[in-house]
Amino acid sequence: MSELTSLTIAEARRKLRAKEITALELTEAYISAIDAANGHLNAYIKVTPDLARLMAKNSDERIAAGKAGDLEGIPLGIKDLFATVGVHTQACSHILDGFEPRYESTVTQNLWDDGAVMLGKLNMDEFAMGSSNETSHYGAVINPWRAAGSNQQLVPGGSSGGSAAAVAAHLCAGATATDTGGSIRQPAAFTGTVGIKPTYGRCSRWGTVAFASSLDQAGPIARDVRDAAILLKSMASVDAKDTTSVDLPVPDYEAALGQSLKGMKIGIPSEYRVDGMPEEIETLWRQGIAWLKDAGAEIVDISLPHTKYALPAYYIVAPAEASSNLARYDGVRYGLRVDGKDIVDMYEKTRAAGFGKEVKRRIMIGTYVLSAGYYDAYYIRAQKVRTLIKRDFELAFNAGVDAILTPATPSSAFGVADENLASDPVKMYLNDIFTVTVNMAGLPGIAVPAGLDQKGLPLGLQLIGKPFDEETLFKTAHVIEQAAGRFTPARWW
């Protein structure tokens, strides 16, 4: 069965269309893999084998009839942030206990319309708030990677840790994810997978549980750049139900792979050389520059002067929006309800019991920065900084830069329950230092595996592009992937 689960989406699609394998055989292989591994990795919080088999049988019928969709018969994992009709959708929070939506998110509906098969719902940080997948009500996800000679459990990154771990461990062919401040790209870098955060508005947010509405964007995590391109083409669409989705044609991203980089300008921002950055991250960055130069791209130094303000501004804007979005969870119509002496007491007890520690922290930060006397000092200033960050990128792109190359993360994956990080949330927030600028500016960004550190753990590079120019990111990331090779964890589970 492992030979089936080792197929990329592109390879599986080819074999399915040639009738060398069936969608049901492929799905059964993944169900068996999940049964064997999930007790060790905790990547899935809900597996849907009966539904998966039914969808696979329907795919086989369409393939036989010559009516195969772009993703016909491809088994996928779905982050628990996406509404799936009649299937557990809780954003990995206790406060949404038992919630099964009567509607389907636009992103997942697009995937099913193209013939994809749902294997189940993937673990994540509660309400997508976290960088390690340790804030989930269902417990931490364990990274399938381990340092050489060590049995220490490592985090897969967050908030899309379940998505990244499942893809890396071959527990799905690909996965949906979301990115508010780095939640696709950081887990991808930590697990040796490819993750792209598209331009804000490229994918509909309808039916996706909101964290910070002006920052949230759905995207795929996949085993390689080609698979990520295939998935994004299906996920992306304009949607009348989401006024922030943009009415632009969705290109054939896969067609961009293999195109020449000759004549392209790649910007290298000096501000991303942060204090205390490990030498191996700097070395990897230099290696990425050399690969792109060898492929014919011109390397130019650029300045993004407001980068240093991005993280503090993000941790004002995102919690402010979260405090508003999460006000709707009160125990009245769905989810957890803790009885109280009156309705206000019920609200308080339900929210106290239902939200985890990190979610409560961010709600309180958001409420504080929006309160009278602090709104101008914090929230308005953070939005002004956001405008300046966006302008920095616009100036770089207007000067002729086609894409920007940076590290994806300041380190490789760290240990589960790291006391140093647990005692100081700001240290955990620093994991987003290279990724939040992209969300603040609404730009596309892709993380691609580029090497291993001294401990044998994956490291990634990030490419940032112009608005709605994901094609350039795919073709450039493909060059890095071809040079670096692909990385798969040694199986220990």
From Swiss-Prot:
PROSITE patterns: AMIDASES. The active site is at K79, S159, S183. InterPro entries: Amidase (IPR000120), Amidase_CS (IPR020556), Amidase_dom (IPR023631), AS_sf (IPR036928), GatA (IPR004412). GO terms for cellular component: glutamyl-tRNA(Gln) amidotransferase complex. GO terms for molecular function: ATP binding; glutaminyl-tRNA synthase (glutamine-hydrolyzing) activity. One of its GO terms (biological process) is translation. Coiled coil: none annotated. The keyword Ligase applies. Keywords: ATP-binding, Ligase, Nucleotide-binding, Protein biosynthesis. It comes from the Bacteria. Its EC number is 6.3.5.7. It catalyses: L-glutamyl-tRNA(Gln) + L-glutamine + ATP + H2O = L-glutaminyl-tRNA(Gln) + L-glutamate + ADP + phosphate + H(+). Transmembrane segments: none annotated. The keyword Cell membrane does not apply. Allows the formation of correctly charged Gln-tRNA(Gln) through the transamidation of misacylated Glu-tRNA(Gln) in organisms which lack glutaminyl-tRNA synthetase. The reaction takes place in the presence of glutamine and ATP through an activated gamma-phospho-Glu-tRNA(Gln). PANTHER family: GLUTAMYL-TRNA(GLN) AMIDOTRANSFERASE SUBUNIT A, TRANSAMIDASE. HAMAP family: GatA. Heterotrimer of A, B and C subunits. Belongs to the amidase family. GatA subfamily. This is Glutamyl-tRNA(Gln) amidotransferase subunit A. It comes from Rhizobium leguminosarum bv. trifolii (strain WSM2304).
